[in-house]
């Protein structure tokens, strides 16, 4: 029921939905669009503000979205309980424009479950038309809408059985449409014609043939002909949709046909269609869909993945190329080059998002680019959005946009990636606490709209509750409870976020709640059969026996405290609502706390419960579509509830302090799931309003802030939504009570406090030093600065005067020039006006003459038409006279015939009367004779009548039985006749079917004969191919003979690489030895640091003593004239500062100095040894590098000769193809032989990324240790290691090239 004023308004959303395809889009240069719940968020990148496009109450969630090319319209595909729809918004006004449902077109014959993709045509047609594509388990239907008038102009079933992903329009031709999906790729053409409307529709399902394609696949191309009738009086013509066969893609390889086509792009630079396959291939087609090539620089061919295969996830186009997002967060940039026809798009940039984001496992879900092409937005699977600033690519320069220069910024927050299990808010601070299935706990600030703390755990947190002061949070895990502090420096996963108290074992805690005062917290301990609510004392951690409440047999879904913490309420899936009174005096008297509410409702699964502000009424909801109300009576337990029927299921409830409104979250599979319903309380009014919030998965938790300003909801879609309450009375009550503002205190640990104090003291010292320095510098340079400024002012004034004079002169000159130009322009305009007047006058005269000529022609034609009319009228009158004469003759003939028939009738009547007279006379005589006979027979009959009466009664009974049997037989006969008629009809239908089957059999016999002929021809071709195969086998054997010695050479090379590996292992062992030495030095350094700290502390103490001693000496000097006082003061000073009577001098032990010198000598010897070993290693590596470079040159030469030989072999094979007569021409094969240099070349095996990473980390550790010893040694060692890395990489490239050539030879 609607008709109420708006009580809440959406203010902010934490979260997004990355399951929707192409969920990220630029609205303009500073605003982006992404879905969140059942809303589309318009996010400003500058001020972080949000605006929203909200769905309607008739539907439940968003399945797809699309922006028009001019960003004028936003189309949302929404899910419904039965049928989906498309909602179109005006982006200028942010209001809903149209709602396109299935009832607007003849779409009831399809099984449409939801819309998968929406596309707007080009800029000229976006205000009228829109195309939509359905899928997700139902029929795959392509629909054409006229959204300006809300009509469906046409639809067609594509017949695809797999998932369909995307639909789009060609930029240059708005009539061509491309559809891609899993094992589906089609191009459709929209043709508007002037044909007469027809009722029949032709359909054909385009399918990808699996087993019938050979090396070149040809698929059927569906062409969508939408023909609208023109010249008809009907204002709403219905379209006619047809499919025609054609070639979709020609020469497409067979292994690509059955792939998953993830995305496609219509390029702006040239008329290319780029199609992306999930397995990493990029297909290049022309604008008609004809296959051109598979790009050589596809990600599959040059990117090495950890999982073994790279996957393409998303793509976006720009003016001169496109970006491709792949798995493992890899982004590639392809640029268009005009001169290269073979490879028009080349990969010019490549980077990984993991280089800029400190996340372990991330995958890209969506990608988009702004119109200026300087910003790239990337959406990740963890619901985060990153903005990357991009520089334009210039082929003249090298390293245009290196990864180090990229600016990467996080746009949104660290959102949850799974459904939210629990949520709670704080009374004294504007914070929200949430836990999710992604094993994280997050603390949000809804006033500053930011995240404060994010923790990650190894196990899932099921529930949590915030302390009213905001310094602590209680979290329930699978087998324990944890109490954790919310500290300032506790936002990361460090050792500081450990719980300060842990309660275990505590099984399956799904609900936990702090009391309003914070002195208690209640938690549910769930075992296999019992569900016990335990109340703990927060400050002591005790759980008294009288605060253990039993009674639930199923899962407890909600716990609530009264406002004064005197009642504890609970409800669960067992259909029970229980309440206990917490009284301190009463608890000490008895060990068992009685229940004040004990309600049992079998078959009801309660999910939410709340109390009114006066603590008198309980309101609960469950899955029975009712609201249950119960009034608390402390004297007598309550066991019944008052029910109010609803049309949906509710999941959670919340009351503001005014008690005038009741907010409820909807979680219903039928309708309106995810919305917030606002009731007017009391519920007898029956008025409510629904507000859209989350998607169809429903609302999980709902809370109202302590000042009644906001209502906060959390859903299973992972989003947190903040709504502002518009009810002024609710906030007025809290303001009258004098409610304080939020507290500004923060919790901090002692170690953090010490660090802050030390940093503060250091900064104060630095400030004092800088202030003193600045004061001294200022006093010295102030006068000089004043003089310089005075001279600058004078010089500037003179320069400005000169500039002003020059500007005046230039101004006068420009004014004169402008006046002259204006006069010239006026003259030109006057001349042009005169010329135009003369032209228009001539044109008008010519038009007048034409008009008069047309008038004359019109009069002549009228005269001719009048003459024709008179002739036609005369001819018509003559024809009418002829027809009248003919019909008059026919009438006369019919009249004569009528007279003859009447005469015959009269004659027959007379004869009939005579016959009747004779019959009457004969009857009279017969009657007289019969009377006489009857009189005689009457007496005999009377005698027999008495006897016959008894017989008659018997016969009557028999007759009645026979009549009944006769009626039954008649009814049976009628039924048999009906069955006979049905059998006749069936017989005729069967005969017709037999005739049709005979015709089909004849047609199939014909086709079988034709196919047998085809098979015979194919067998002939197969025999020819076998002959050709025999020749190729012979050639392959010859090639294998040549390959064997090359394989031997490769084995020798592998042995050499193994030797190199052993040498590298020795180097690693030497590096490890150096690492141990560095660790020992590091430990000595730490001990030295500790000694330095102690010495500094002693120095500070001594300085304090010295300052105090100076003060005492100064006070003693005041009494230098008075000898007695001077003696007393000196004695006092002696007693104060001299504790020991004898002062001993400290002397350094000689053994310590000897050990120190010996250690110094040993370290110097080690340094000299390291220098010598490094010099030797440098010389060895230089020689190896020179030798390896020479071998690489030889290898490159050999590879070039092998490539030339492979090309000659392929040309020879093409020339050996059999001609029509079956003859072949053999070409001699020449295989190059490897040189002896290639045998001795060292080639390393491929090195894994993990080994490379471990080596780099070891090198970094060694470098850190060496910096403490000698910087010159570190630089030399680093140069050697860098040269080794480059050598290894070069050898790895050579090894990969050899494997590639070997693979080509084996294929040839």
Curated annotation (Swiss-Prot):
Entry superkingdom: Eukaryota
Residues annotated as transmembrane: none
Subunit and interaction comment: Forms a heterodimer with CFAP57A. Associates with components of the nexin-dynein regulatory complex (N-DRC) and the CFAP184:CFAP263 complex.
Family: Belongs to the CFAP57 family.
Protein name: Cilia- and flagella-associated protein 57 C
Extent of the WD repeats: 57-99, 110-154, 415-454, 504-546, 551-590, 645-689, 694-733
Record key words, sorted: Cell projection, Coiled coil, Repeat, WD repeat
UniProt feature coiled coil, ranges: 779-1000
UniProt function note: Associates with components of the nexin-dynein regulatory complex (N-DRC), a key regulator of ciliary/flagellar motility, and might act as an inner dynein arm (IDA) hub or linkage.
InterPro entries xref list: CFA-57, WD40/YVTN_repeat-like_dom_sf, WD40_repeat_dom_sf, WD40_rpt
Location in the cell: Cell projection, Cilium
Disulfide bridge partners, by residue number: none
Gene Ontology cellular-component annotations: cilium
């Amino acid at each position: 029921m609607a008709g109420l004023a708006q009580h809440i308004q959406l203010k902010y959303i934490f979260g997004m939905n990355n399951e929707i395809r192409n969920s990220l889009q630029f609205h303009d240069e500073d605003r982006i669009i992404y879905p969140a719940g059942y809303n589309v968020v318009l996010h400003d990148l500058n001020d972080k503000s949000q605006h929203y496009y909200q769905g309607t109450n008739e539907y439940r969630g968003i399945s797809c979205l699309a922006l028009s090319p001019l960003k004028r319209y936003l189309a949302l595909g929404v899910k419904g309980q039965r049928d989906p729809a498309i909602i179109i918004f005006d982006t200028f006004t942010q209001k809903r424009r149209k709602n396109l449902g299935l009832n607007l077109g003849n779409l009831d014959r399809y099984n449409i479950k939801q819309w998968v993709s929406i596309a707007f045509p080009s800029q000229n047609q976006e205000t009228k038309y829109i195309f939509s594509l359905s899928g997700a388990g139902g029929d795959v239907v392509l629909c054409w809408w006229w959204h300006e008038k809300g009509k469906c102009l046409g639809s067609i079933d594509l017949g695809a059985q797999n998932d369909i992903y995307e639909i789009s329009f060609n930029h240059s031709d708005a009539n061509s449409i491309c559809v891609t999906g899993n094992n589906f790729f089609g191009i459709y053409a929209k043709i508007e014609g002037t044909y007469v409307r027809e009722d029949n529709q032709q359909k054909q399902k385009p399918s990808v043939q699996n087993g019938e394609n050979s090396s070149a696949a040809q698929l059927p191309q569906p062409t969508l002909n939408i023909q609208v009738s023109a010249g008809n009086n009907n204002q709403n013509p219905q379209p006619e949709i047809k499919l025609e066969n054609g070639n979709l893609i020609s020469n497409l390889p067979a292994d690509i046909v059955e792939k998953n086509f993830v995305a496609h792009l219509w390029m702006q630079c040239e008329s290319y269609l780029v199609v992306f396959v999930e397995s990493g291939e990029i297909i290049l087609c022309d604008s008609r869909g004809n296959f051109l090539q598979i790009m050589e620089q596809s990600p599959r061919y040059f990117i090495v993945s950890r999982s073994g295969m790279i996957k393409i996830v998303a793509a976006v186009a720009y003016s001169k190329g496109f970006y491709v997002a792949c798995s493992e967060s890899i982004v590639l940039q392809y640029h268009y080059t005009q001169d290269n026809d073979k490879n028009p798009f080349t990969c010019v940039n490549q980077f990984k998002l993991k280089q800029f984001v400190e996340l372990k496992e991330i995958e890209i879900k969506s990608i988009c680019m702004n119109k200026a092409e300087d910003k790239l937005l990337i959406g990740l699977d963890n619901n985060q959005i990153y903005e990357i600033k991009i520089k334009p690519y210039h082929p003249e320069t090298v390293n245009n946009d290196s990864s180090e220069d990229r600016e990467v910024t996080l746009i949104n927050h660290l959102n949850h990636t799974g459904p939210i299990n629990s949520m709670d808010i704080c009374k004294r601070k504007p914070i929200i606490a949430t836990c999710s299935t992604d094993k994280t706990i997050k603390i949000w600030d809804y006033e500053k709209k930011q995240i404060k703390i994010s923790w990650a755990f190894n196990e899932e947190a099921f529930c949590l509750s915030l302390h009213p002061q905001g310094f602590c949070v209680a979290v329930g895990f699978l087998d324990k409870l944890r109490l954790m502090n919310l500290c300032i420096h506790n936002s990361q996963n460090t050792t500081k976020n450990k719980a300060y108290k842990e309660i275990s074992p505590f099984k399956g805690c799904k609900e936990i709640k702090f009391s309003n005062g914070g002195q208690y917290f209640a938690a549910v301990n769930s075992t296999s059969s019992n569900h016990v609510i335990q109340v703990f004392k927060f400050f002591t951690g005790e759980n008294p026996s009288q605060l253990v409440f039993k009674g639930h047999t199923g899962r407890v879904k909600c716990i609530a405290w009264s406002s004064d913490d005197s009642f504890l309420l609970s409800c669960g899936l067992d259909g029970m609502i229980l309440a206990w009174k917490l009284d301190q005096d009463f608890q000490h008297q008895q060990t068992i706390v009685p229940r004040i509410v004990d309600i049992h409702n079998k078959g009801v699964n309660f999910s939410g419960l709340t109390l009114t502000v006066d603590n008198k009424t309980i309101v609960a909801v469950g899955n029975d579509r009712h609201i249950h109300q119960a009034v608390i009576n402390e004297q007598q337990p309550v066991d019944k509830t008052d029910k109010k029927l609803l049309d949906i299921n509710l999941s959670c409830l919340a009351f503001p302090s005014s008690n005038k409104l009741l907010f409820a979250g909807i979680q219903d599979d039928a309708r309106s799931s995810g919305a917030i319903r606002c009731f007017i309380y009391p519920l007898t009014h029956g008025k409510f309003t629904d507000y859209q919030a989350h998607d169809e998965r429903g609302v999980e938790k709902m809370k109202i802030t302590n000042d009644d300003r906001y209502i906060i909801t959390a859903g299973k879609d992972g989003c947190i939504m903040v709504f502002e309450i518009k009810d002024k009375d609710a906030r007025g009550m809290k303001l009258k009570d004098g409610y304080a503002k939020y507290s500004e205190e923060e919790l901090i640990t002692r170690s953090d406090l010490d660090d802050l104090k030390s940093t503060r003291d250091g900064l104060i010292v630095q400030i004092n030093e800088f202030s003193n320095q600045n004061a001294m510098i200022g006093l010295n340079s102030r006068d000089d600065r004043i003089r310089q400024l005075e001279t600058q002012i004078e010089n500037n004034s003179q320069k400005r005067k000169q500039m002003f004079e020059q500007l005046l002169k230039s101004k006068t000159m420009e004014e004169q020039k402008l006046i002259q130009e204006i006069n010239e322009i006026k003259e030109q305009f006057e001349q042009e006006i005169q010329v135009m007047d003369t032209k228009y006058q001539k044109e008008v005269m010519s038009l007048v003459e034409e008009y008069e000529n047309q008038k004359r022609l019109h009069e002549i034609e009228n005269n001719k038409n009048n003459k024709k009319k008179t002739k036609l009228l005369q001819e018509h009158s003559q024809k009418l006279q002829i027809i009248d004469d003919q019909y008059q003759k026919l009438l006369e003939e019919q009249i004569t015939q009528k007279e003859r028939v009447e005469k015959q009738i009269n004659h027959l009547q007379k004869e009939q009367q005579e016959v009747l007279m004779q019959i009457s006379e004969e009857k009279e005589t017969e009657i007289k004779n019969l009377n006489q006979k009857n009189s005689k027979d009457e007496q005999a009959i009377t005698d027999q009548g008495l006897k016959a009466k008894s017989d008659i009664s018997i016969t009557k009974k028999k007759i009645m039985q026979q009549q009944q049997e006769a009626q039954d037989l008649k009814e049976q006969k009628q039924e048999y006749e009906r069955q006979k008629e049905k059998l006749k009809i069936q017989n005729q239908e069967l005969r017709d079917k037999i005739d049709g089957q005979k015709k089909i059999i004849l047609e199939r016999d014909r086709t079988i004969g034709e196919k047998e002929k085809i098979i015979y021809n194919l067998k002939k071709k197969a025999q020819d191919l076998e002959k050709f195969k025999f020749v190729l086998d012979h050639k392959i054997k010859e090639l294998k003979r040549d390959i064997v010695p090359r394989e031997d050479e490769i084995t020798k090379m592998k042995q050499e690489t193994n030797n190199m590996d052993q040498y590298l292992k020795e180097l690693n062992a030497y590096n490890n030895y150096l690492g141990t030495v560095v660790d020992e030095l590091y430990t000595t350094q730490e001990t030295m640091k500790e000694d330095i700290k102690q010495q500094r502390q002693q120095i500070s103490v001594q300085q304090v003593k010295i300052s105090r001693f100076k003060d005492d000496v100064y006070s003693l000097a005041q009494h230098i004239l008075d000898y007695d006082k001077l003696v007393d003061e000196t004695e006092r000073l002696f007693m104060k500062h001299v504790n020991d009577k004898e002062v001993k001098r400290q002397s350094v032990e000689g053994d310590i100095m000897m050990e120190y010198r010996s250690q110094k000598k040993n370290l110097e010897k080690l340094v000299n040894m390291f220098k010598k070993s490094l010099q030797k290693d440098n010389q060895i590596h230089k020689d190896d590098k020179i030798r390896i470079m020479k071998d690489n040159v030889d290898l490159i030469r050999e590879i070039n000769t092998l490539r030339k030989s492979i090309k000659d072999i392929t040309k020879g094979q093409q020339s050996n193809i059999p001609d029509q007569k079956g003859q072949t021409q053999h070409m001699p094969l020449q295989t190059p032989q490897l040189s002896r240099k290639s045998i001795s070349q060292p080639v390393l095996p491929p090195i894994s990324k993990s080994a490379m990473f471990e080596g780099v980390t070891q090198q970094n550790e060694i470098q850190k240790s060496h910096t403490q010893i000698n910087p010159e040694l570190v630089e030399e060692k680093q140069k050697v290691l860098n040269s080794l890395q480059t050598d290894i990489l070069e050898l790895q490239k050579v090894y990969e090239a050899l494997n590639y050539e070997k693979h080509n030879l084996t294929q040839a």
